[in-house]
Amino acid sequence: MDNITINNRSQIVIQEDTGNQSYVAKIWLYDITADQLTEVAHHDQDRFAPGAPNFLTQDEESSGVIDASAILGEGWYLLDQQAHYATDAELVEGGQLLALHIPPGKKLQVR
């Protein structure tokens, strides 16, 4: 586990950094009250699992998650996805900025 943020519903959003391992990184939601950990997102296995058809790298992570509820509405988060592979000199490496919605008040399925 790497980066976290806490929302106003006693839940922690947790991001994984796999550290250049073949395991595809995930994003988790930990509900403090229910003591329940649920996977809410994962990186694209077609791009980050070794041997996949569109493989880029196994060195991926998401980072910098912030609760954006005050700006985008309840259940919205902003984060970045870092794909540690070489690209053109202007960009340095792959990645993107993401908006993630975790619906509030909805029972999440445990995976």
Per-segment meaning from a language model:
Residues 1-111:
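Sequence/structural signature of beta-propeller domains
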